[in-house]
């Protein structure tokens, strides 16, 4: 199986969730072995997508370099990962990626418009050999050995619209688009005033998030999936796993996970070199199976 990029440049204009300012996003092809590279057009600064460039995970995943930063990148990265894209220039003219509708389906549609093309260099993956876990009290995230990419997530909120939710998802591009991509970010009315006092959630609305009061959901259209809340947690984690730079072969288990825990797991995994191996997907039989995973179903 070969590395992939997009067939042509595509662009979209939106607003950032936390800063609420307009942003112009452009996606452009890059040569093989380039990786995923963010570029702040307004500042002229490139920020390669690497764990060392993560500077904050409080409310979103934020990367930065040379005084430039780009935040709320997880939904965009989730779609890029799901489409198996290895090399891409991600150019923005502001400090936050567009929130779209709070999910990643808009980015999937943008990638469909661009088209996905194979390159000459072989694709690589990080295959888990032994479990790695990161905990924060009762909360934890863990990766385990597996022959497929599988996400087994659970959350628990003391709210009548959420309570306990679990979802088990075997990764493929087609399944991602059907089961995960439309799951929206969510927040609570009682948190909004505090967040806005901190300069956050300024672009949030019922058009780009599930909003909950004390008793239920304020969005008139309701939920897109029965377990939309936990499915969005999977969407976020897939985006955070894109920081590895190559796809993960293993099972990702999470209870009450967060951007912070996802990032700590990535750092811990890369530190424990005996817990994984980098595999080339050149083996014909294995490549055929991986190609099936990244088939879009279009």
UniProtKB/Swiss-Prot annotation:
Catalytic residues identified in the record: 259
Q: Where does Zn(2+) bind?
A: 75, 232, 236
**InterPro entries linked:** Ribosomal_Su5_D2-typ_SF, UDP-acyl_GlcNac_deAcase, UDP-acyl_GlcNac_deAcase_C, UDP-acyl_N-AcGlcN_deAcase_N
Describe its function.
Answer: Catalyzes the hydrolysis of UDP-3-O-myristoyl-N-acetylglucosamine to form UDP-3-O-myristoylglucosamine and acetate, the committed step in lipid A biosynthesis.
Task: Please list every transmembrane segment annotated in the UniProt record, as residue ranges.
Answer: none
* Keyword Kinase found: no
Known pathway = Glycolipid biosynthesis; lipid IV(A) biosynthesis; lipid IV(A) from (3R)-3-hydroxytetradecanoyl-[acyl-carrier-protein] and UDP-N-acetyl-alpha-D-glucosamine: step 2/6
What protein name does the entry list? Answer: UDP-3-O-acyl-N-acetylglucosamine deacetylase
Report the family membership: Belongs to the LpxC family.
- The record lists the organism as Wolinella succinogenes (strain ATCC 29543 / DSM 1740 / CCUG 13145 / JCM 31913 / LMG 7466 / NCTC 11488 / FDC 602W) (Vibrio succinogenes)
Cofactor (UniProt)? Zn(2+)
Q: Which reaction does it catalyse?
A: a UDP-3-O-[(3R)-3-hydroxyacyl]-N-acetyl-alpha-D-glucosamine + H2O = a UDP-3-O-[(3R)-3-hydroxyacyl]-alpha-D-glucosamine + acetate
Q: Name one GO cellular component term.
A: membrane
Q: Which GO terms describe its molecular function?
A: metal ion binding; UDP-3-O-acyl-N-acetylglucosamine deacetylase activity
Enumerate the UniProt keywords alphabetically: Hydrolase, Lipid A biosynthesis, Lipid biosynthesis, Lipid metabolism, Metal-binding, Zinc
E.C. code: 3.5.1.108
Q: Which Gene3D superfamilies match?
A: lpxc deacetylase, domain 1 (3.30.230.20), lpxc deacetylase, domain 2 (3.30.1700.10)
Q: Could you give a single Gene Ontology term from the biological process aspect?
A: lipid A biosynthetic process
What's the superkingdom here? Bacteria
């Amino acid at each position: 199986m070969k590395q992939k990029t997009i067939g042509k440049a595509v662009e979209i204009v939106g607003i950032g969730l936390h800063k609420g300012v307009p942003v112009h996003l452009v996606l452009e092809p890059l040569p093989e072995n380039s990786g995923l590279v963010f570029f702040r057009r307004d500042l002229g600064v490139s920020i390669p997508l690497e764990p060392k460039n993560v500077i904050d995970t409080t409310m979103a995943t934020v990367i930065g370099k040379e005084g430039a930063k780009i935040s709320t990148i997880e939904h965009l990265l989730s779609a890029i990962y799901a489409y198996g894209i290895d090399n891409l220039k991600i150019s923005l003219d502001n400090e936050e990626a567009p929130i779209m509708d709070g999910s990643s389906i808009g980015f999937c549609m943008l990638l469909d418009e661009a088209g996905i093309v194979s390159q000459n260099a072989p694709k690589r993956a990080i295959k888990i050999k032994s479990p790695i876990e990161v905990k924060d009290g009762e909360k934890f995230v863990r990766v385990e050995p597996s022959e497929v990419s599988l996400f087994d997530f659970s959350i628990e909120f003391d709210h009548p619209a959420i309570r306990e939710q679990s979802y088990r998802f075997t990764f493929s591009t087609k399944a991602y688009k059907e089961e995960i991509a439309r799951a929206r970010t969510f927040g609570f009315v009682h948190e909004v005033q505090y967040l806005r006092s901190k300069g956050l959630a300024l672009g949030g609305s019922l058009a780009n998030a599930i909003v909950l009061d004390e008793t239920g959901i304020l969005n008139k259209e309701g939920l897109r999936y029965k377990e939309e809340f936990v499915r969005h947690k999977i969407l976020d984690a897939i985006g955070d796993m894109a920081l590895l730079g190559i796809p993960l072969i293993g099972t990702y288990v999470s209870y009450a996970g967060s951007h912070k825990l996802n990032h700590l797991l990535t750092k811990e995994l890369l530190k424990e070199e005996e817990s994984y191996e980098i595999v080339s997907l050149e083996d014909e039989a294995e490549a055929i199976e991986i190609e099936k995973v990244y088939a879009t179903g279009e």
